[in-house]
């Protein structure tokens, strides 16, 4: 856990990156080309790759080239951004749902706190993308109203606004990425710790079960083999006239049956005792795991608590 939290602190101190002027025109395509702002962005998850495509398209729009200007006059740009935004939020929701399913044996209160944290981060990211789309739709209306006039000042204001929106989008994307990474790391560590604990508890129990099986099965097997040998010898000696031996054989069968029932009853009693010990060992283990998860959530909230849990209404 110490290594996990040390890595988290280093990540948080790294900041969200600088505001960078747009580079040369970048045509949108299937490959995710994030630019210098996202040099440290690791797009390994589907939602991260989808967000990278949104970011790449936004960088191309911000160049405000002649081709971009032509498409802005139509609804093509806003429609494309809408599709990319919907795809991103769909993947974010899927990732969040998968993580919540993997939380395992934690209390409902802890699950609710984790869900609230991720929901707030997800909402901030969605609000950022929605504002980008709304601003471009507004620019489209302003551009159509100024046909035949100079739009240099209008383009300058849009470019400056988009830079601010990109910076906010990057900040909130990294915040969501950090939260997901911390909880996923906690799940992996908790699972590994649980497996080791189970092995420590189940190892002696497995050995005990094997010992009980040996103690029960060996006498029965030896008894059956001895009885079979005696019966075979008597039948051979008698020349197979088994009628006069039937009563004796029946008595021996009943004797073996009684022994089997006695041994089975002993096994049942030992199994019930085994079940009771197993339950008494597992209940503290589950409670300990729930407590560890509650502590993990509190540490995450303290580490990234500088970011509000609700979507800000004030436009930056």
UniProtKB/Swiss-Prot annotation:
Subunit-level organization: Homotetramer. May interact with ABCA1; functionally associated with ABCA1 in the biogenesis of HDLs. May interact with APP/A4 amyloid-beta peptide; the interaction is extremely stable in vitro but its physiological significance is unclear. May interact with MAPT. May interact with MAP2. In the cerebrospinal fluid, interacts with secreted SORL1. Interacts with PMEL; this allows the loading of PMEL luminal fragment on ILVs to induce fibril nucleation.
Protein's name according to its UniProt entry: Apolipoprotein E
Highest taxon of the lineage: Eukaryota
Residue stretches spanning the membrane: none
Region (Specificity for association with VLDL): 277-289
One Pfam family this sequence matches: Apolipoprotein
Coiled coil: none
Function: APOE is an apolipoprotein, a protein associating with lipid particles, that mainly functions in lipoprotein-mediated lipid transport between organs via the plasma and interstitial fluids. APOE is a core component of plasma lipoproteins and is involved in their production, conversion and clearance. Apolipoproteins are amphipathic molecules that interact both with lipids of the lipoprotein particle core and the aqueous environment of the plasma.
Post-translational note: APOE exists as multiple glycosylated and sialylated glycoforms within cells and in plasma. The extent of glycosylation and sialylation are tissue and context specific. Glycated in plasma VLDL.
Homooligomerization: region residues: 265-316
Region (Lipid-binding and lipoprotein association): 213-289
UniProt entry keywords in alphabetical sequence: Chylomicron, Endosome, Extracellular matrix, Glycoprotein, HDL, Heparin-binding, Lipid transport, Lipid-binding, Oxidation, Phosphoprotein, Repeat, Secreted, Signal, Transport, VLDL
């Amino acid at each position: 856990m110490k290594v996990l939290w040390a890595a988290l602190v280093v990540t948080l101190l790294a900041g969200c990156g600088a505001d960078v002027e747009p580079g040369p025109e970048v045509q949108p395509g299937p490959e995710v080309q994030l630019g210098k702002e996202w040099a440290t962005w690791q797009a390994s998850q589907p939602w991260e790759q989808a967000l990278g495509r949104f970011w790449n398209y936004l960088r191309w729009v911000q160049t405000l080239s002649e081709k971009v200007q032509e498409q802005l006059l139509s609804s093509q740009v806003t429609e494309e951004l809408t599709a990319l935004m919907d795809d991103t939020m769909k993947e974010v929701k899927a990732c969040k749902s998968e993580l919540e399913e993997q939380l395992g044996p934690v209390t409902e209160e802890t699950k609710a706190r984790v869900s609230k944290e991720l929901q707030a981060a997800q909402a901030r990211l969605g609000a950022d993308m929605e504002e980008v789309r709304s601003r471009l739709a507004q620019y489209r209306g302003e551009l159509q109203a100024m046909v035949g006039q100079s739009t240099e000042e209008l383009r300058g204001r849009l470019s400056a606004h988009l830079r601010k929106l990109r910076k906010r989008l990057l900040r909130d994307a990294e915040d969501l990425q950090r939260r997901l990474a911390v909880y996923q790391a906690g799940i992996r560590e908790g699972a590994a710790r649980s497996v080791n604990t189970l092995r420590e508890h189940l190892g002696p129990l497995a050995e005990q079960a094997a010992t009980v099986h040996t103690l029960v099965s060996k006498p029965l097997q030896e008894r059956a083999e001895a009885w079979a040998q005696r019966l075979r010898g008597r039948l051979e000696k008698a020349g197979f006239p088994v009628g006069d031996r039937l009563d004796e054989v029946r008595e021996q069968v009943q004797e073996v049956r009684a022994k089997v029932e006695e041994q089975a009853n002993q096994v049942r009693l030992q199994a019930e005792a085994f079940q009771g010990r197993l339950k008494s060992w597992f209940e503290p283990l589950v409670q300990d795991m729930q407590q560890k998860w509650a502590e993990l959530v509190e540490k995450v909230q303290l580490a990234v608590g500088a970011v509000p849990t609700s979507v800000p209404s004030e436009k930056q």
